[in-house]
Amino acid sequence: MRSRQSNKDQRGLDAAGACSLAALLSVAFCILPAMATPSSNVESGAEQSQPSIHLDKKFKGNLPITELTEDEAILHALDRLGYGPRPGDVERVRRMGLEKWVDQQLHPDSIDDSALETRLEKYSTLNLSSKKLLDRYPPPEQAAKKEGVTKAEFKSEQQQKRRDAVEQVALTGNDNLDRAQQQLAKIQGPNRIIAELSMAKLDRAVYSQRQLEAVMEDFWFNHFNVFANKGADKWMVTSYVRDTIRPRTMGKFQDLLIATAKSPAMLFYLDNWLSADPIAYQRMQAEIAARRRRYQGIFVNGAPPQPGTFGGPPSGPTNRPAAQKNPDRGLNENYGREVMELHTLGVDGGYTQQDVIAMAEVLTGWTVHEPRKDPEFFFDDRIHVHGKEVVMGRTFNSGGIKDGEEALRMLANHPSTAKFISTEFARHFVSDNPPQTLIDRMAQNFQSTNGDIRSVLKTMIFSPEFWSREAYRAKVKRPFELVASTARALDADVPVTLPLTNWVGRMGEPFFLCQPPTGYSDKAETWVNTGALLSRLNFALTFAGGKLAGTNVNLAAVFGPEAGTDPHQALNRALEIFLDGQVAQTTRDTLEARLSDPQILQARLDDPVKQVNEGLIAGLVLGAPEFQRR
């Protein structure tokens, strides 16, 4: 697998017409130290002891910005509360006023996002229920059985369908676009569901005007992670994102928590749908077996029962439970543990193993109706543990589904949850090691507003720690953030985002495929090493060089005509466009050393005047540590 990945990366370098691998390694080793440690001091001369900066009140409103310049504050907001600036965004925010822009992002329903919705119409799976997805994209074994063929025959038919789909792609004459459409056409069956969901996720990050909403959707999915490749979850994740996460990104935390707890995707992923009172379950199984024997006419006298008579099958439809394959089904602690450790209280939240068991018992009966046919949440009182349960010192004895709902509300409003969620917010939006003063302020707001997500975010954004010099460019972009921000910076037109989603996966963050419930790490140490940096440089060079399938990049429009023949001018222009001219001297020296590379200036047969390879320069700048940070 590693060899195959290396070959893919090298092909990307060759396709981009980039520097030699040795040159790239030299760049990587030069900028790796800058990536590994926060670096907020740039060539603009910002020092830790700098005097307070006074910004126009009309621009900043009540935002407590005293250490960042106007341009820095705008870039900071666009990078932290969104996926970075597109050309023209900085001036647009400046004209609007930063506080007004922030307030607008905190209220996404006030923002017209119809252009994005039009773009998403091409994805046929996004608005389908889990049942319809199962009907339209059934598992291979089920589809083969339905068609009356063997699994091998069905596989052969699918391969032919993929070939037919590729042949039916209407070629546009644009090699990049045609290749991407052909790649997408090959994805048939259930894999199409996750492919379209992934492409739509990237479309939202790149093209949505509701940038903070897109960030929060990603944050909450990562927080309440499910693994799409676990059995039936592949058909349930679309609904999980659309119906559970997205509508609640800035509402009450307890509403989001309960919605995820009732989601078939979460119930299936953490096995709570199988959790049952062992004694009640065995009793129910015995009753089902006895009922089945009666229905089959297995009596001492051998006489089959008559329809509509006592002991015989009813003449109308019934809701008889299906036979369970696992006769030893009992209490499952997975969700009871993770809802405390990962979703609410945190690992040091003050709960015990007995609390985990009690929470699992409170949530027995929270299950899924036919997960591989028509997955819907329902509460099955027959397998619920009845009786008094004590979780975190609180007794639950209402009975039925209410016990679970009350227990989840208790966890959602616990002081440890306020601290844990506030820490997660601050780590994502401010720094890997956020100030305790900020966390305490956010946690206090969390408790006073009963977990109002929008209010907690506003408290964070309107805190001086958010706008501090230490927080500026202190976060390393995860692969998803890097890919989205690069597409935005290049003002790229990406009709088919599949190649971009593939790059996110190649750099270590495949969408919806994080197997452990922890989700992907938000800390730099996970993403910073020489191998990862080479992959990031490779991506930037391939994308900026116009060689990435499914993308259109017009660097001439971005750079302007003046950079055409002077590599130094082109570099300065790239630094200004992509980094607002804010770059450390060590980075500038490293980049300028590459300007002597023969690939930088090239002549064509029809034009002896050497032209700057703008794609290579742009790619190197986009691979710089300042752009890799947000």
Regions found by a protein language model. Give the residues of each.
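N-terminal accessory alpha/beta regions
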Residues: 85-219, 223, 228-239, 244-248, ...
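N-terminal secretory signal peptides that target proteins for export/translocation
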Residues: 1-15
